[in-house]
């Protein structure tokens, strides 16, 4: 059986990896979106760990809501990415610095 400490450590490691992905690679939109999704999954691991430790299902239900919002966020982010690539022919954030209609 996995202890609470191990699950929290896993969540912290995933969160730190996602922070490193955001800070080390700010130019690529795909890496930024993947890092944000990994950050949300790290938070979900912590919710599941505490929910399991306390014997309450509220944390597990909250994770389902977070996953739903994360899926919608990923769909909107990918739609923006496709539009960005079609108009500017790049996915580099540094090259796209102006919002034009």
From Swiss-Prot:
Pfam families: Oxidored_q2. One of its GO terms (biological process) is ATP synthesis coupled electron transport. GO terms for molecular function: NADH:ubiquinone reductase (non-electrogenic) activity; quinone binding. It is a multi-pass membrane protein. One of its GO terms (cellular component) is plasma membrane. Keywords: Cell inner membrane, Cell membrane, Membrane, NAD, Quinone, Translocase, Transmembrane, Transmembrane helix, Transport, Ubiquinone. NDH-1 is composed of 14 different subunits. Subunits NuoA, H, J, K, L, M, N constitute the membrane sector of the complex. NDH-1 shuttles electrons from NADH, via FMN and iron-sulfur (Fe-S) centers, to quinones in the respiratory chain. The immediate electron acceptor for the enzyme in this species is believed to be ubiquinone. Couples the redox reaction to proton translocation (for every two electrons transferred, four hydrogen ions are translocated across the cytoplasmic membrane), and thus conserves the redox energy in a proton gradient. Belongs to the complex I subunit 4L family. HAMAP family: NDH1_NuoK. NCBIfam families: PRK05715.1-2, PRK05715.1-3, PRK05715.1-5. This is NADH-quinone oxidoreductase subunit K. It comes from Xylella fastidiosa (strain Temecula1 / ATCC 700964).
């Amino acid at each position: 059986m996995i202890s609470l400490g191990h699950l929290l450590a896993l969540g912290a490691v995933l969160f730190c990896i996602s922070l490193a992905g955001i800070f080390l690679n700010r130019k690529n939109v795909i890496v930024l979106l993947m890092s944000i999704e990994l950050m949300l999954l790290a938070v979900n691991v912590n919710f599941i760990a505490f929910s399991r430790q306390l014997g309450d299902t509220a944390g597990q239900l909250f994770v389902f809501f977070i996953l739903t919002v994360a899926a919608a966020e990923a769909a909107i982010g990918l739609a923006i990415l496709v539009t960005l690539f079609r108009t500017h022919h790049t996915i580099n954030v540094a090259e796209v610095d102006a919002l034009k209609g």
